[in-house]
C-alpha cells in the first residue's frame, strides 16, 4: 500500500497530466529516445516535477526554505509531504531569478544501489552504485530515522556539508518487511551558514572533516580503513609480511 504522501503526489501528477499533457508531449518531441519505455519514464519524471510544484509551489516553498534554513522535517510538516519529496524539491530551486542552494541528492538501498541521483553541488556521484562507504548516506542505516550531518572532504580538497536519513517506503501489513532507503542531501561548505544542519558543526575545523572519495576504484586514499578494492590508477604495494584492516590497506600504502 502507498503512503498518504505518495497518494497525494500521484493525485497531483494526474492533475498535471490533465492540465499540461500537451505541453509535456510537445517538449518530449524534441528529443530522441531509444525506446518507448524510456520516453514514458521521462514523462513520468516531468509529471512528478509538476506534481511537486503543485504541492510545494516555488515561491512559497523557497521562502519557507530560507526562513527555516532548509530544515527538511519542518518543511515536511509545513507542506504535508514526505521527507524524500521535500529533499527532492529543494534540489529544484534553481530559477535564476530566485535561486536556492545548489544541492546534491541521492537515494540508496541497503545493498548500496543508487536509485536516484542529482548533483547540482558539483560532487561526483557514481551512476549505478559502489559509492564511497564513508558517505553518511550509508551510515544512516545504523540509526534509522535520525538525521546525520557531516562535513565531507573529497580528494580534490572540495568540502561538502552532507546530511542523510533513512525512510520507509509503503505501508505494509503486520509482519511484512518494509522497504528501507537512505536519502542523502548536501551542498558546498560555503553555503553552511544557510543550512540549519551545520549549527552544531564547525565547518572550518579540519578535525571534524570526514575524508571521502567517489568509489574505491577511483580513490587515492590508500590508508582508508574501509577500502574494499584497490585503485585502478595507482600502483598498489602488496606486503606479505604485514596485515592491516584489509589486504588493500597496509603501512606501506599509508605513507
PLM segments and residue spans:
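Conserved binding/catalytic microenvironments
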Residues: 1-222, 226-254
Amino acid at each position: 500500500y502507498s503512503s498518504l504522501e505518495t497518494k497525494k503526489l500521484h493525485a497531483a501528477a494526474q492533475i498535471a497530466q490533465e492540465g499540461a499533457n500537451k505541453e509535456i508531449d510537445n517538449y518530449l518531441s524534441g528529443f530522441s529516445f531509444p525506446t518507448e519505455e524510456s520516453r514514458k519514464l521521462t514523462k513520468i519524471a516531468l509529471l512528478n516535477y509538476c506534481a511537486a510544484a503543485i504541492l510545494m509551489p516555488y515561491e512559497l516553498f523557497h521562502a519557507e526554505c530560507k526562513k527555516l534554513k532548509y530544515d527538511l522535517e519542518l518543511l515536511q510538516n509545513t507542506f504535508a509531504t514526505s521527507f524524500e519529496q521535500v529533499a527532492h524539491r529543494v534540489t529544484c530551486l534553481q530559477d535564476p531569478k530566485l535561486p536556492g542552494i545548489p544541492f546534491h541528492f541521492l537515494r540508496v538501498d541497503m545493498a548500496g544501489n543508487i536509485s536516484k541521483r542529482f548533483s547540482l553541488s558539483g560532487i561526483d556521484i557514481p551512476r549505478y552504485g559502489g559509492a564511497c562507504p564513508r558517505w553518511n548516506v550509508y551510515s544512516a542505516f545504523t540509526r534509522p530515522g535520525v538525521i546525520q550531518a557531516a562535513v565531507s572532504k573529497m580528494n580534490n580538497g572540495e568540502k561538502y556539508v552532507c546530511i542523510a536519513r533513512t525512510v520507509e517506503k509503503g505501508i505494509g501489513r503486520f509482519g511484512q518487511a518494509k522497504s528501507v532507503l537512505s536519502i542523502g542531501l548536501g551542498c558546498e561548505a560555503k553555503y553552511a551558514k544557510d543550512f540549519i544542519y551545520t549549527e552544531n558543526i564547525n565547518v572550518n575545523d579540519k578535525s571534524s572533516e570526514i575524508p571521502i572519495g567517489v568509489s574505491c576504484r577511483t580513490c587515492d586514499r590508500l590508508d582508508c580503513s574501509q577500502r574494499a578494492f584497490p585503485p585502478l590508477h595507482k600502483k598498489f604495494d602488496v606486503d606479505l609480511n604485514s596485515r592491516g584492516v584489509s589486504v588493500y590497506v597496509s603501512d606501506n600504502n599509508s605513507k
